[in-house]
Design a protein with these regions (language model features):
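Short hydrophobic beta-strand element within catalytic cores of glycosyltransferases
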Residues: 264-269
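Short alpha-helical segment that forms part of, or immediately flanks, the ligand-binding pocket
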Residues: 232, 255-260, 274
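Conserved donor-binding/catalytic core segment of Leloir-type glycosyltransferases
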Residues: 18, 157, 168-184
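Nucleotide-activated donor-binding/catalytic signature segment of Leloir-type glycosyltransferases, i.e.
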Residues: 71, 207-229, 237
Length: 377
């Protein structure tokens, strides 16, 4: 039997909620779980206990240290090992964020709160509570039968930026992107940027935590970070966001961060996951669908054009206090059985058909670009 060695944990009469993270990285799952854990204590006055998969080779030590600085944080080899700590810490619930399919991340001894982030068939419902991450998922795939808990959107307060540090002139247009390492994977979008900087000298692209796809002094790649102040400096540096992820977003935290600062989102038209579009007014984003359309958008971009701040931006509703009241409502009340009707199954099926339409449109152009257009451009 495994010997469990843990640091002192203050005895408390507060309700203890455990949070499980399979990969400690710079991406949305880890970032959002940190904020839920933080405000579970600050707003809901509960106790947060962190578990993570210590066997995951992709863990970032700096992220683990960030959690350990704030919470009692314990590494385990698998999800079921958390049950060893049930009585020691009087765990009431275990929260886990995942794709949404039935798997081994569910406990028979601890009430498991499943927060899912990808479209799923309704037959995948499991756990003590099953909650989706966005109104797009809830409406398009569950007919609003599954409760919704959005991410918390929180930005550090500063007016400073990175232009001086990165040696970017004040009059330069700066278009930025941040997210997971593979979040800018559209080859034709990459090629468009490379072509544009050769022809247009007053534009610079800055990528945070994105895999490097070229070498040019005005296409800058910054290492990923868990430092929220640095992220805000990066956001302040940019005049707009360039989005180039083929899959799209089931919530779109990075898009929300840019939009919350009233910056235009330049997005791909044929993403399968389209929550980032659902949250915003059409005046807050512009979509490209080809190399030519993206080139024209970027070439004609005017940094002095201001967005109307009164236009729809539902990301602004994702403030800590408001989100944690939803967390309490959907996760911490008595279990309520979700009744699924034939209409709900039809809506779910229709959602997948629509998503596949976007996928087919995406594949058609990208194959055309790969085998024909890229050869002559």
């Amino acid at each position: 039997m495994q010997v469990v060695v843990v640091k002192h944990f203050v005895n408390t009469s507060l309700m203890v909620i455990a949070f499980y993270i399979d990969e400690m990285n710079f991406r949305g799952v880890a970032n959002s779980t940190f904020l839920y854990s933080k405000y579970n204590e600050v707003v809901l006055k509960n106790k947060s206990l962190i578990f993570y998969n210590k066997s995951n080779a992709n863990n970032k030590n700096v992220v683990i240290k960030k959690f350990k600085k704030k919470f009692k944080t314990i590494g385990v080899n698998n999800f079921s090992a958390i049950e060893q700590y049930l009585y020691k810490y009087k765990i009431k619930y275990i929260y886990t964020q995942k794709g949404g399919k039935k798997d081994t991340w569910v406990s028979n001894k601890i009430k498991t709160l499943v927060h899912y982030v990808y479209p799923q068939k309704l037959s995948e419902i499991h756990g003590y509570k099953y909650v989706c991450v966005s109104s797009w998922l809830g409406s398009q795939f569950t007919n609003n039968k599954i409760p919704i808990l959005p991410y918390i959107l929180e930005l550090k307060k500063t007016h400073k930026n990175l232009r001086k540090k990165l040696k970017i002139k004040k009059n330069q247009i700066v278009i930025g992107c941040h997210g997971g390492e593979s979040s800018f994977d559209l080859k034709f979008a990459q090629d468009t940027l490379k072509n544009l900087v050769r022809k247009k000298t007053n534009i610079t692209f800055v990528f945070l935590n994105i895999n490097k796809f070229c070498k040019h002094r005005r296409i800058i790649f910054l290492k990923g970070t868990s430092n929220e102040t640095f992220k805000r400096l990066f956001l302040n540096t940019c005049d707009a966001m360039i989005y180039g992820r083929s899959l799209g977003e089931s919530f779109g935290m990075a898009c929300g961060e840019f939009a919350s600062l009233n910056k235009l989102i330049i997005s791909y038209k044929y993403n399968r996951h389209r929550s980032h579009i659902d949250y915003l007014s059409k005046t807050r984003y512009i979509e490209y669908y080809s190399k030519k359309s993206l080139f024209n958008i970027l070439n004609n971009f005017n940094k002095n054009d201001k967005l109307l701040s009164n236009k729809k931006n539902n990301y602004l509703l994702c403030q800590p206090k408001a989100v944690m009241q939803i967390f309490k409502k959907v996760f911490l009340n008595d279990k309520s059985h979700v009744k699924i009707s034939i209409v709900d199954y039809f809506v779910n099926y229709a959602g997948f058909i629509k998503m596949n339409y976007y996928y087919v449109r995406h594949k058609i152009y990208n194959q055309y670009y790969k085998f024909f257009e890229s050869k002559f451009s």
